[in-house]
Amino acid sequence: MFLLVLAPLTSGCLRVNASITVSPDDVVSGEIIAASKPRDDKDLGPQFDENLPFGQKVSVSSYDADGYVGSQAVFSGLSFAELPQLANLSEDASGVDISLRRAGNLVILEGRVDLTNVTDAEADVTFSAAFPGEVTSTNGDRVDTDVVQWQLKPGVVTTMSAQS
C-alpha cells in the first residue's frame, strides 16, 4: 500500500511517513511523504509519479521542510482494492505489501515491509492507520483507541497487523 522509496535510503538521512484513514464506508484517505536530506542544491529527493489509473484521487506535490526535500502525495476516495496500487507512485517502491479488507464488522489491516536494503540507521520510517472504530488487536503502537502506528526499523522485515 504505502510506499518506500529505496534509492535514497542507502545514503543520507531519509524520512518516509505514511498515514491512512479508513472511513466507516471503507473509503481510504491519507498522505505519504518521502524525503531525504539533499546531497547538493540540485537534489530534489525522492520523486513520485502521479500517473495512476485513479490519478484524480491523488495529488502529488514537492516537499521541502526541516532540511528534507522530496515528494508528498495526498489521496482520498480510494477503495481497499486501489490502496496497494499507491506503490506505483515510485518505480523505486519495493518490499511493501499492505492490504485492507473487511470481514463482517471488522476492518483488517495486514502488511509486510522489507527494509533489509536500507542501510541508513537514522532513517525515520513510520506508518499509521486510523480506523472507523476501536482497534481490538494490533502488533503496532496504539496512539489512540482507533489509531495505530508502526516505527519501521531499517535493516529488517516488519509485519503489521491490526483489527478494528
Segments from the language model and where they lie:
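Post-signal-peptide N-terminal segment of Sec-exported extracytoplasmic proteins
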Residues: 37-62
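Residue-level marker for the onset of beta-strands and adjacent loop->beta junctions
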Residues: 16-18, 146
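N-terminal Sec signal peptide cleavage junction
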Residues: 12-13
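Mature, soluble, non-transmembrane domains
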Residues: 57-164
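Buried hydrophobic packing residues in well-ordered domains
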Residues: 18-20, 26, 127
